[in-house]
Each structure stands twice: as C-alpha cells, then as structure tokens.
UniProtKB/Swiss-Prot annotation:
Annotated protein name in UniProt: Protein YopQ
Highest taxon in the source lineage: Bacteria
Organism field: Yersinia enterocolitica
GO CC aspect terms: extracellular region
Signal peptide: 1-24
Gene: yopQ
Subcellular location: Secreted
Keyword terms: Plasmid, Secreted, Signal, Virulence
Keyword presence, Signal: yes
Length: 182
C-alpha cells in the first residue's frame, strides 16, 4: 500500500501553471472550469515553490511522501508521465492490472476542490478492493463505481491507476531524469 494522503489537486495544478509555466508540456481545462489537468516535467525548485503555495505537508504518517525528494517524484509521475481518464474507463483499466497486485488510484470529483489518492488490491481471482484512507472504508467490486460516480449530481472522477511495480519503476526513471537535468 502506498500514497495514503489526499491533497488539493486543483490548487496544485493552478500553482503549477503559475509557478512553472516553462515546464508545462500540455494543460487542458474543461469548459465549466471545474477541473484542470496538467502534464509537466517538474524540477526540484518547482516542487519547493508548489509546496509553499499549496501547503502540501510532505511529512505525514503512513505516507511515502516523507521527503521533498519523494514528493517531487510522486508529483512528477502524476503530472508528467500519465494521462487522466474518465471514470467510465475504470473496468478496462482495472483489468489491465495483474492479479495479486497493489495499486493506487487518484481521483478528483467535479465541483470539489479535493483530489484523493486511495489504495487498492487486486486479488488472485481478479477481485478489486479499494481502501479510502480518510475514513478507512473498504470499497468492494459492486460499490466501486457507486463510490466514484454520482449519477444524481452528474459528477464524475478523473482517475489515474498506478500499479506498485510501475510506481517503483517510474520513481527510478523520474529520479534519473531529474539528476540528468540537474
């Protein structure tokens, strides 16, 4: 299990746009301005600036974001190396994950400033379980879409799935690229 904290995704994207415009590769904004997506390569100084602006606390119990270096890697992975996807693709993406694996899922609900990072497991039979670190709820297969998608309010999630092995691999790649770029 990894990345157990929630943080303000919209503020992070806004700060990213303001603090490091030269590093932005691609940004997009929905017509209703409800959310931002950004893809960028972040340097260490950019992360320091983002931490100061957004108020992310890198030292939190139970989190891998225990140092600024790890925060840089996590933010870099989320915003530089992955694309956001609509929650309707959730089944397809879960099927791609290998059985007996841990993974993380990042989502942000429209009209809600907070983006959450939750963890999950895929067992040997392919069943999915999600764990919400905020209230320690266990969300099982039948309730996952209900948890992530509210038809009554026409809200949906922007999501990112990271397998644990991918996270470790991309952390190394991110660190290597950062070191190369100085």
């Amino acid at each position: 299990m990894f990345i157990k904290d929630a943080y303000n995704m919209r503020a992070l994207c806004t700060a990213l746009e303001q603090s490091a415009p030269d590093t932005i590769i691609n940004t997009s904004k929905e017509e209703n301005n409800s959310y931002y997506c950004a893809t960028a390569h972040l340097l260490r100084t950019d992360v320091c600036s983002l931490v100061n602006r957004v108020g992310i606390e890198p030292l939190k119990s139970g989190s891998i974001l225990s140092t600024l270096e790890e925060l840089w890697q996590a933010v870099g992975i989320i915003y530089r190396l992955y694309e956001w996807q609509h929650v309707s693709d959730i089944d397809t993406n879960f099927k791609k994950l290998p059985n007996n694996s841990d993974f993380g899922l990042v989502f942000s609900v429209l009209d809600c400033d907070i983006g959450y990072v939750i963890t999950g497991k895929k067992d040997s039979k392919g069943n999915i379980e999600l764990y919400d670190p905020k209230n320690s709820l266990l969300i099982e297969n039948d309730d996952i879409k209900k948890y992530l998608y509210d038809e009554n309010f026409h809200r949906f999630c922007i999501m990112l799935i990271i397998s644990k092995s991918e996270l470790e691999e991309l952390s190394r790649e991110s660190c290597d690229q950062k070191c190369i770029m100085g």
